[in-house]
């Protein structure tokens, strides 16, 4: 909803407050039943207070390592488990960093598909470097990873995966 213009936001306020819409050529149309409306926001701009007052909020955090593994397994079923583990561990590590835009699950899936199409069996530094654009959308974020050294970031992701595996095994 935050990507819509102010006219559409005003339209939503009318729908959510009065359960009706006014169309100049037709008139006012009222809902026979109270509608169930789901709005999503990426927080690209601030919404008006009038609209926020009419909404309940559910913040959805990034998935856990295990949940992301399940998602990759269902969306990219041909991915080998070890590659999927490496990808998910790498993504979990990236999300712990201070980036302009942290990668979401869509980027995880896109990256897994890209790596598979390249025939990758594991996260090789050269392949990771050439595919960072799949997961990080800003040049400054890509440069942060490159400055840290991709082999070192891969190693940190491996240590994170191992720590997560030990914790879930308990």
Stretch-by-stretch model annotation:
Residues 1-170:
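C-terminal regulatory/interaction module of P-loop NTP-utilizing enzymes
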